[in-house]
Amino acid sequence: MTRSLKKNPFVDNHLLGKIEKLNMREEKEIIVTWSRASTIIPTMIGHTIAIHNGKAHLPIYIIDRMVGHKLGEFAPTLTFRGHARNNNVSRR
């Protein structure tokens, strides 16, 4: 279910503060965050945010087409290692 239009998009306070500081100083540096539920807002465009996937932080460069999506959508948590091998020889 989507978020109500009456509410504002969720952005974690510490993440929003870091982005606003960098925008005021006009600096670009990697922002490390565990907040996968935060929504990407227009002030984040042009920044690189390292999003935690459960094991490591994946650096993601934010572009205008990502606005409105959640940060967690761009850092997959599972890696597909392939289906189980069909080994008929071992069954005999």
UniProtKB/Swiss-Prot annotation:
It holds the Pfam family Ribosomal_S19. Belongs to the universal ribosomal protein uS19 family. GO terms for molecular function: rRNA binding; structural constituent of ribosome. InterPro entries: Ribosomal_uS19, Ribosomal_uS19_bac-type, Ribosomal_uS19_CS, Ribosomal_uS19_SF. Its main location: plastid. Protein S19 forms a complex with S13 that binds strongly to the 16S ribosomal RNA. GO terms for cellular component: chloroplast; mitochondrial small ribosomal subunit. PANTHER family: RIBOSOMAL PROTEIN S19P FAMILY MEMBER (PTHR11880), SMALL RIBOSOMAL SUBUNIT PROTEIN US19M (PTHR11880:SF8). It comes from Drimys granadensis. GO terms for biological process: ribosomal small subunit assembly; translation. It comes from the Eukaryota. Keywords: Chloroplast, Plastid, Ribonucleoprotein, Ribosomal protein, RNA-binding, rRNA-binding. It is found in: Plastid, Chloroplast. This is Small ribosomal subunit protein uS19c.
